[in-house]
């Protein structure tokens, strides 16, 4: 059954072309020729079964976990904290001191810990029990729940959803975007960051990572609009060059502020940006 490539979930097109095989999941990847959405697998049931077995076998962050430490000073954790510094600058005008934040996919906890330090009341959702047990020991104002997003069952309501490099792992993003509405105050904001498929001369190719979908900016916006969300912003980001770093260092030393507004990440265009960031709002009117 080819239900995942019978019609594009983003634009409705039926024009897909085979791209390559996902080497981790052992299923084909197809590309929608209209919106450039990359679709992993042909059968929804087959993909769900494969992903379930993969994560039950602790694949999630398996390789990275070997280099992680509880003080979060390892290379991966430091890079995630740097990413957070850029992301919080991007979203801060949509947050208040009373905002209740729901982070989907907390991982090792870098974002959750930093939000906790800023005194935001944040709840993290994380399927990896090892990560959950570690975070419960160090969080102060915030909390972490051991659950997959598919099995999430909580009575609380939130004002802001934070998803950093998680949305691309969802095999049924339309259902997620609709189902999560019951846990949110209306109106609410949603922040998503995902890898971009539109960067030219991209070394990544997306052939190894267990992503259910990989998005272009248009495809991501279409999926959100389809479920009633209003797009506030959609931008492309990437790492700074040495020149960017030097300019920013001079600015912080002399003027006590960043030269680039979202440093240590750079606001780029679709051809050069590695990642897509979207802020969307759901008002409950649709």
Enumerate the language-model features and the residues they cover:
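Short, electropositive alpha-helical surface patch
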Residues: 245-256
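Feature marks short, surface-exposed loop/turn motifs that line or immediately flank catalytic pockets
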Residues: 187, 198-200, 238-240
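A SAM-dependent methyltransferase catalytic signature shared across enzymes that methylate proteins
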Residues: 9-17, 218-235, 253-255
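A short His-aromatic
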Residues: 165-169
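A short glycine-rich, Lys/Arg-flanked "PGG" loop and its adjoining helix->strand segment in the class I
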Residues: 174-189
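Conserved N-terminal segment of class I S-adenosyl-L-methionine
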Residues: 1-164, 174-177, 236-237, 249, ...
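Short, glycine-/aromatic-enriched active-site segment of Class I SAM-dependent methyltransferases
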Residues: 191-223
